[in-house]
UniProtKB/Swiss-Prot annotation:
Family statement: Belongs to the microviridae H protein family.
Gene3D superfamilies reported for this sequence: 6.10.250.2700
Highest rank taxon of the organism: Viruses
Any one Gene Ontology molecular-function term assigned to this protein's record: identical protein binding
First-listed, main subcellular location of the protein, grouped into a coarse class: virion
Subunit architecture: Interacts with B, G and F pentamers to form 12S pre-assembly complex. Joining of twelve 12S complex form the procapsid.
Alphabetical UniProt keywords: Capsid protein, Host-virus interaction, Viral genome ejection through host cell envelope, Viral penetration into host cytoplasm, Virion, Virus entry into host cell
Organism: Enterobacteria phage phiX174
InterPro entries for the chain: Microvir_H (IPR006777)
Primary role: Self-assembles within the capsid. Upon host cell recognition, probably forms a tube that serves to deliver DNA genome to the host cytoplasm. This tube protrudes only at the time of infection.
Name of this chain's protein: Minor spike protein H
Localisation: Virion
Keyword check for Nucleus: no
């Protein structure tokens, strides 16, 4: 830097000196000092101080209180001013060019500038993708794409959850159905067992009552038949079974025939009381079978069999009423 300044000053001094010596390429004035006047090609000036100063300095007369600048100082001032202005201008341009070069914009084509910009952004923002580094639109596109991915994941999660819920509901329904089926079977089994127990108990009670009636010697045959029918009909009504008048008449006839048979066999045997107990069950069976709907209570016969017995009491045409009836 200092070498450049010194060189500039020397060059300016040399140029100024030559210009002063040779008149800047103009011929020297002819003439000289003649007496008390200074003669030139154009005019004649008096030799007084004022005339000389006016002729040399022109109309711009310097302040007499200030020292007149020498030739060397004036030349150096001009050279320094020019050097400073040139240096500042050159420095500013160099700094600008350097800054442009740093960002990749100094004296390059549009393609090179774009490539440099992309490289710069990629190095400055490595966490962004190319679309996001390109600008707001690209960033929006990236956000939209991310939104699509999120929506896909959300939809997949919802479908998976629905599938799991459906499977859980299906398994729960299976378990409930299994529990209900097992409970129903158990309830049916318990009901059947209870019904069988009730039937056995009622059959036993019926037989005991018939035997008690038959053993009562104070009752006439008609009274025995009436008592047997009364207790059997009461038992049937308790079970919700009702008979028509025709059915009751037919049942009474059969019970009467059985009572006659019991009395006859009792008279023919030595131990009649024991025979009464044995045959009381036969009478109970006759009444039970004849009671049609009551057969569900005593024997557990289904509805079809009960209907068959009901039809028997209506038309008197049924097969296999019982072995007891064959003895009437």
């Amino acid at each position: 830097m200092f070498g450049a300044i010194a060189g500039g000053i020397a060059s300016a001094l040399a140029g100024g000196a030559m210009s002063k010596l040779f008149g800047g390429g103009q011929k020297a004035a002819s003439g000289g000092i003649q007496g008390d006047v200074l003669a030139t090609d154009n005019n004649t000036v008096g030799m007084g101080d004022a005339g000389i100063k006016s002729a040399i300095q022109g109309s711009n007369v310097p302040n007499p209180d200030e020292a007149a600048p020498s030739f060397v100082s004036g030349a150096m001032a001009k050279a320094g001013k020019g050097l400073l202005e040139g240096t500042l201008q050159a420095g500013t341009s160099a700094v600008s060019d350097k800054l442009l070069d740093l960002v990749g914009l100094g004296g390059k084509s549009a393609a090179d500038k774009g490539k440099d910009t992309r490289d710069y952004l990629a190095a400055a923002f490595p966490e962004l993708n190319a679309w996001e580094r390109a600008g707001a639109d690209a960033s929006s596109a990236g956000m939209v794409d991310a939104g699509f991915e999120n929506q896909k994941e959300l939809t997949k999660m919802q479908l998976d959850n629905q599938k799991e819920i459906a499977e859980m509901q299906n398994e729960t329904q299976k378990e409930i159905a299994g529990i209900q089926s097992a409970t129903s079977r158990q309830n049916t089994k318990d009901q059947v067992y209870a019904q069988n127990e009730m039937l056995a108990y009622q059959q036993k009670e019926s037989t005991a009552r018939v035997a008690s009636i038959m053993e009562n010697t104070n009752l006439s045959k008609q009274q025995q038949v009436s008592e047997i029918m009364r207790q059997m009909l009461t038992q049937a009504q308790t079970a919700g079974q009702y008979f028509t008048n025709d059915q009751i008449k037919e049942m009474t006839r059969k019970v009467s025939a059985e009572v006659d048979l019991v009395h006859q066999q009792t008279q023919n045997q030595r131990y009649g009381s024991s025979h009464i107990g044995a045959t009381a069950k036969d009478i109970s069976n006759v009444v039970t079978d004849a009671a049609s709907g009551v057969v569900d209570i005593f024997h557990g016969i289904d509805k079809a069999v009960a209907d068959t017995w009901n039809n028997f009491w209506k038309d008197g045409k049924a097969d296999g009423i019982g072995s007891n009836l064959s003895r009437k």
